[in-house]
């Protein structure tokens, strides 16, 4: 499906829970400010089933921390049984060592691990948890079982800026495929922490100089730099960036049962909780959810637009 701004809808991003075992001071919480109402596995899979009718073929599972859901493996298996080409997950990696193999068997295709520091001290300052070594073990387990490409997310801020290039070195040594250097943006807890925002321009300019190839990714038109080692460095700058918004191809299912058309906005969401919890047959629910998707696509628009 194409929205009225010519943007294809290809990706469903599902928040499985707001609960997390870390306390990162900048967490954007997927732009959600509602209660931690947890949709059932059946609710999630029903929405995903309807989304397939709109040519959505990719699902990203997020949180909070998705590995805290006891039915995570079953959800992944259900999504693959629906025929999704790509099922991936973003995790803090704390429980990944124990879950990686089970998730791979269930059909998880690839994984993003949030790693915002390269030292135990900085890691604890950012997350509130002394778990750097445990997360590294989780990353190694993901690589070993074949959850590839393994991508590492690094939110750049004033507390970890000096570790960026050592982070690139660590990533190369670990054998990961790709890293994302992400701008801190004022969403969720990031609103309170935006004073820690750090401009990525100088970092990106240096990475471009040492790279052997520059690519532009279709999603969000993100710049990607291939280093001589083969590591891909993707720079993600969503805030006040109309180019980023012009390439957005996703819709979100919030933890409290809303179709959310933009990370930054709460004024153009479609509440589908009553449909999911209503006493309707599954056929009727599918029809009503289909209508909800149509409305969501109709009202979907870039938050940051080009000024003409």
From Swiss-Prot:
Keywords: 4Fe-4S, GTP-binding, Iron, Iron-sulfur, Lyase, Metal-binding, Molybdenum cofactor biosynthesis, Nucleotide-binding, S-adenosyl-L-methionine. Residues 4-224 form the Radical SAM core domain. S-adenosyl-L-methionine binds at residues 64, 114. Its cofactor is [4Fe-4S] cluster. It comes from the Archaea. GTP binds at residues 13, 60, 90, 151, 250-252. It catalyses: GTP + AH2 + S-adenosyl-L-methionine = (8S)-3',8-cyclo-7,8-dihydroguanosine 5'-triphosphate + 5'-deoxyadenosine + L-methionine + A + H(+). Its EC number is 4.1.99.22. [4Fe-4S] cluster 1 binds at residues 20, 24, 27. One of its GO terms (molecular function) is 4 iron, 4 sulfur cluster binding. Pathway: Cofactor biosynthesis; molybdopterin biosynthesis. GO terms for biological process: Mo-molybdopterin cofactor biosynthetic process. Pfam families: Mob_synth_C, Radical_SAM. SUPFAM superfamilies: Radical SAM enzymes. It is an enzyme of class 4 (lyase). CDD domains: Radical_SAM, Twitch_MoaA. Binds 2 [4Fe-4S] clusters. Binds 1 [4Fe-4S] cluster coordinated with 3 cysteines and an exchangeable S-adenosyl-L-methionine and 1 [4Fe-4S] cluster coordinated with 3 cysteines and the GTP-derived substrate. [4Fe-4S] cluster 2 binds at residues 245, 248, 262. Catalyzes the cyclization of GTP to (8S)-3',8-cyclo-7,8-dihydroguanosine 5'-triphosphate. Belongs to the radical SAM superfamily. MoaA family. This is Probable GTP 3',8-cyclase.
């Amino acid at each position: 499906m194409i929205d009225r701004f010519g943007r294809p809808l290809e990706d469903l991003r599902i928040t499985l829970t707001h609960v997390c075992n870390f306390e990162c001071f900048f967490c954007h919480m997927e732009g959600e400010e509602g209660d931690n109402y947890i949709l059932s596995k059946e609710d999630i899979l029903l929405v995903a089933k309807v989304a397939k009718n709109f040519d959505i073929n990719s699902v990203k599972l997020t949180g909070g921390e998705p590995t805290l859901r006891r039915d995570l493996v079953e959800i992944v298996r259900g999504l693959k049984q629906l025929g999704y080409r790509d099922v991936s997950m973003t995790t803090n990696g704390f429980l990944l060592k124990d879950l990686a193999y089970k998730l791979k068997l269930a059909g998880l295709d690839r994984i993003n691990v949030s790693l915002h520091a390269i030292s135990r001290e900085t890691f604890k300052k950012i997350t509130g948890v002394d778990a750097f070594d445990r997360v590294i073990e989780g990353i190694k387990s993901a690589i070993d079982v074949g959850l590839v490409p393994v991508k590492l997310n690094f939110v750049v801020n004033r507390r970890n800026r000096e570790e960026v290039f050592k982070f690139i070195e660590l990533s190369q040594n670990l054998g990961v495929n790709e890293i994302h250097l992400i701008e801190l943006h004022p969403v969720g807890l990031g609103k309170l922490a935006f004073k820690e925002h750090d401009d990525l321009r100088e970092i990106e300019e240096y990475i471009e100089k040492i790279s052997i190839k520059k690519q532009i990714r279709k999603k969000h038109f993100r710049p990607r730099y291939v280093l001589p080692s083969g590591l891909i460095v993707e720079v993600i700058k969503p805030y006040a960036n109309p180019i980023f918004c012009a390439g957005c191809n996703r819709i979100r299912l919030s933890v409290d049962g809303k179709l959310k058309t933009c990370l930054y906005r709460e004024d153009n969401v479609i509440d589908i909780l009553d449909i999911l919890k209503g006493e309707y047959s599954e056929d009727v629910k599918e029809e009503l959810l289909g209508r909800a998707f149509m409305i969501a696509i109709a009202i979907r628009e870039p938050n940051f637009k080009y000024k003409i």
